């Protein structure tokens, strides 16, 4: 009976693991998330850089 809780916990851990895709990706297949992450980071940096100069006099500041 001592093994039952351990067995239940192992079953829960196995069930919560992400599924594996059965089809392997070809060598030239690049996930789009890598491109979107760089675009989002550049957009955020540009926005912050543009807000640095105009928020001093509050004329074009979008933050409060």
UniProtKB/Swiss-Prot annotation:
Keyword presence, Disulfide bond: yes
Subcellular locations according to the entry: Secreted
Gene Ontology terms, MF aspect: toxin activity
Modified residues (Isoleucine amide): 63
Alphabetically ordered keywords of this record: Amidation, Disulfide bond, Secreted, Signal, Toxin
Pfam families: Chi-conotoxin
Tissue distribution: Expressed by the venom duct.
Residue intervals passing through the bilayer: none
Posttranslational mods: Contains 2 disulfide bonds that can be either 'C1-C3, C2-C4' or 'C1-C4, C2-C3', since these disulfide connectivities have been observed for conotoxins with cysteine framework V (for examples, see AC P0DQQ7 and AC P81755).
Superkingdom field: Eukaryota
Propeptide residues per the UniProt entry: 23-52
Name assigned to this protein: Conotoxin Pu5.2
